[in-house]
Curated annotation (Swiss-Prot):
Coiled coil: none annotated. It comes from Dechloromonas aromatica (strain RCB). The gene is truB. Keywords: Isomerase, tRNA processing. It catalyses: uridine(55) in tRNA = pseudouridine(55) in tRNA. This is tRNA pseudouridine synthase B. NCBIfam families: TruB. Belongs to the pseudouridine synthase TruB family. Type 1 subfamily. Pfam families: TruB-C_2, TruB_C_2, TruB_N. The keyword S-adenosyl-L-methionine does not apply.
Length: 299
């Protein structure tokens, strides 16, 4: 007799340290099964070759996952100098090799060129679509199409280590930044070429890797232990001010109706009733606080 899993409402945020070689969706589904969570989603894809912070949203937390998609990110990246690949990372075919005779002073001179607002041409080996087809499918057929440059922002690049032909960087950047494109561009500027050999995401928005858990660690815990690793839904909303509502106003907000706007509130706020999150509101028509997203947390 086949066992049928009993899915349940689980509301919260899991800070997962994604392992090497696993897709973001596979990591999500494995974590979801461990929690028996009826609904789940992740907050921005990490390639299989990348590790690190992958916030997972369960239940009502999925309503806020898009906010992290738009958040700034920080990565630790290892560049292999002297070797370029067609994909820009270690999975691709080698397209060129060169001797590496680079001094740290040259690295220090080149890196600042990439800080600020820059233009990146998305790689062919990416999930961007052309006429409904992902670019990586075209790339696998040997087809290359023209791609429009995209504006991204690099807030900071720090050299963490430089040894031989390996250059380790910490990169703080805006959403949509392709670190393997940055790696290739830095290699080109150094005159030797480069590809992305390893990538680890360490910050998403205000959330840091240090509070994360691995799938292997989750598998050793019982149900109570796993639930202790789950952050509340409002862990994604810590940058928003708090508004408290009571009685009839709380009921109005829960049913999608506006409530009184607190003095001085100019943007979105997280709204609580009796100490429980009931949604996010923002100022709107009539000088009132209008519901933007509502949540119904399980007891």
């Amino acid at each position: 007799m086949q066992f049928k899993r009993a899915w349940k409402q689980v509301d919260g945020v899991l800070l997962l340290d994604k392992p090497l070689g696993m897709t973001s969706n596979d990591a999500l589904q494995k974590a979801r099964r461990l929690f028996s969570a009826a609904k789940g989603g992740h907050t921005g894809t990490l390639d299989p070759l990348a590790t690190g912070l992958l916030p997972l949203c369960f239940g009502e937390a999925t309503k806020f996952s898009a906010d992290l998609l738009d958040a700034d990110k920080t990565y630790e990246a290892v560049l292999k100098l002297g070797v370029t690949t067609d994909s820009g990372d270690a999975e691709g075919q080698v397209t060129s090799t060169a001797m590496v005779d680079i001094q740290k002073e040259q690295v220090s001179e080149v890196l600042p060129r990439f800080v600020g607002d820059i233009q990146q041409i998305p790689p062919m080996h990416s999930a961007l679509k052309r006429n409904g087809r992902p670019l990586y499918e075209l790339a696998r057929q040997g087809i290359e199409v023209e791609r429009e440059p995209r504006a991204v922002t690099i807030f900071a690049i720090d050299c963490l280590d430089f040894s031989g032909d390996l250059l380790t960087l910490r990169v703080a950047c805006s959403k949509g930044t392709y670190i393997r494109v940055l790696a290739a561009d830095i290699g080109k500027a150094l005159g030797c070429g480069a590809h992305l050999a390893a990538l680890r995401r360490i910050v998403v928005g205000d959330i840091r890797l240090g509070n994360s858990v691995t799938l292997a660690e989750l598998e050793t815990l019982d149900e109570a232990g796993r639930m202790e690793r789950l952050l509340p839904v409002d862990a994604l909303l810590q940058s928003l001010p708090i508004v408290g509502v009571e009685g009839p106003e709380a009921e109005r907000f829960r049913h999608g109706n506006p409530v009184s706007l607190p003095a001085g509130l100019a943007g979105k706020a997280r709204v609580y009733a009796e100490g429980r999150l009931i949604g996010v509101g923002e100022p709107g028509h009539g000088g009132l606080l209008w519901p933007k997203r509502l949540v119904q947390l399980a007891d």
